[in-house]
Design a protein with these regions (language model features):
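Conserved MFS/SLC helix-loop-helix module at the cytosolic interface between two early adjacent transmembrane helices
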Residues: 74-112
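Helix-loop-helix hairpin linking two adjacent transmembrane segments in secondary transporters
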Residues: 152-197
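Cytoplasmic helix-loop-helix junction between adjacent transmembrane helices
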Residues: 118-157
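C-terminal transmembrane helical hairpin of 12-TM major facilitator-type secondary transporters
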Residues: 292-337
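Juxtamembrane intracellular "pre-TM" segments in multi-pass secondary transporters
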Residues: 10-19, 200-232
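Helix-to-loop junctions at the C-terminal end of transmembrane segments
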Residues: 76-87, 277-290, 375
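Paired small-residue
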Residues: 102, 113-121, 317-325
Length: 412
């Protein structure tokens, strides 16, 4: 598929290469994205506490995670695309304040119904903020550094996702699960001022589409862009595998013979940071034309991870190795996917990221729901078998949809 991005005539001249985005701004995008996405994942190491507090069975408590993913899906369809027709800076401010309110509401929930409604709102607004920031970063970056900037911001997302479990586990042991969401609300207020002061004015101006026309155009993008279709399905399968692991991990580790605290269980998220940091250059590799090779290696890492993960009952070191492989593969594939889709339609970054992440939300929700039910009936080995099958499907799908190798062109 042809890209709508035209290469500037001066690209080959290093002296005339456009100035890059300041490192401080790249870091702000990464930190803010990480804090926003963490809100969606705080519940994962708290499932046993939530089940006990609200009288929800282990087989059904995965519905708490699914509620956040339903919120994610609604955000991706209804809120994230607004960045293409509204002032992104003002949109960020309104969504951030609404997210703070949703976090406070979760901390005060007194029934399972109120909890699920609050989790849906957190998923809705946390996702809108996160993906809005990713699209913002892509639009603010020059074409020659888009992969690097998106990769850095997405690394912040991935690390925030992983550290959410550490944060939630530690705060829960100190102040209960309700304290986790109160602290999260305070963190969002703390990042509000730096975001408002530093977010740049995007080079692209908001479009003139009506909201109805905007939503309709998303369907057209989904039907027309093969890159989006292929990378979306890969994201669905990859995030299903990712959530199959992380949503189930708390259940065996909190039970005998381990009996780990929430802090100890959440600390396993720190191990995942190693894999995420190792994959941080995936966006740069995509900029250099190695997107398909990176995808293949990432998917193989995702599949191989399930072997050591299945040995957790005999060795926690095997669990550590498996987490590194799983997060390495997931992060590298995710960054590569986004780098590729952002190159298709520069004027539609918010809609593209919304559609792409809709696949992610569906995969995450299905993975969370399937893994808790699988664990209740088949234990940890059943979870690992499920993850292996989903990861293998992702690798096979990439193989049958990969583009043909380019033919060699003789140099003059």
């Amino acid at each position: 598929m042809k890209s709508n991005l035209s290469l500037p005539s001066y690209q080959g001249d290093a002296l005339l290469k456009p100035a890059g985005m300041p490192s401080s701004l790249v870091w702000l995008f990464a930190v803010a994205s990480g804090l926003c996405v963490a809100n969606v994942y705080y519940a994962q190491p708290l499932l046993d506490a939530l089940a006990l507090d609200f009288g929800i069975s282990y087989a059904a408590v995965g519905g708490v995670i699914t509620a956040t993913q339903v919120g994610c899906a609604l955000a991706l369809l209804l809120l994230v695309p607004l960045g293409d027709i509204m002032n992104r800076r003002h949109l960020m401010g309104m969504q951030l304040l609404a997210l703070v309110s949703a976090l406070v509401a979760v901390s005060m929930a007194q029934s399972a119904t109120a909890l699920l409604a609050g989790m849906l709102a957190v998923g809705l607004l946390g996702t809108a903020m996160t993906q809005g920031l990713i699209a913002y970063a892509a639009s603010a970056a020059a074409p020659h550094e888009q992969g690097r900037v998106v990769g850095a911001a997405q690394s912040g997302v991935f690390i925030g996702l992983l550290l959410a479990r550490v944060f939630a586990g530690g705060i829960s042991d100190l102040a209960g699960w309700r304290g986790v969401y109160l602290c999260a609300a305070m963190l969002m207020l703390a990042i509000a001022l730096p975001l408002w002061r530093r977010l740049p004015t995007p080079a692209t101006t908001p479009g003139s589409l009506s909201y109805t026309g905007l939503i309709h155009s998303m369907l057209m993008l989904l039907l027309q862009e093969k890159t989006l279709q292929v990378r979306g399905v890969l994201a669905l399968l990859m995030f299903a595998a990712f959530n199959i692991f992380w949503s189930a991990l708390v259940l065996p580790l909190s039970a005998p013979p381990y009996g780990f605290s929430h802090t100890a269980i959440g600390a396993f998220g720190l191990v995942g940071v190693i894999g995420a940091l190792a994959a941080a250059r995936a966006g740069t590799w995509a900029d250099r034309g190695y997107a398909e090779r990176t995808s293949a290696l990432a998917l193989m890492s995702l599949l191989l991870a399930w072997l050591p993960l299945s040995l957790m009952e005999w060795s926690l070191w095997a669990l550590v190795i498996g987490i590194v492989l799983l997060d390495l593969g997931g992060q590298a594939l995710h960054v590569t996917n986004q780098s590729m889709i952002f190159r298709t339609r520069p004027e539609a970054h918010s809609r593209l990221v919304g559609l792409y992440m809709l696949f992610y939300a569906i995969g995450s929700g299905l993975g969370a729901l399937a893994t808790t039910a699988t664990y209740a009936h088949a234990g940890w080995q059943g979870v690992c078998l499920l993850g292996t099958v989903v990861s293998l499907l992702a690798l096979l799908f990439w193989w049958v949809t990969r583009p043909p190798l380019p033919t060699a062109v003789a140099r003059p």
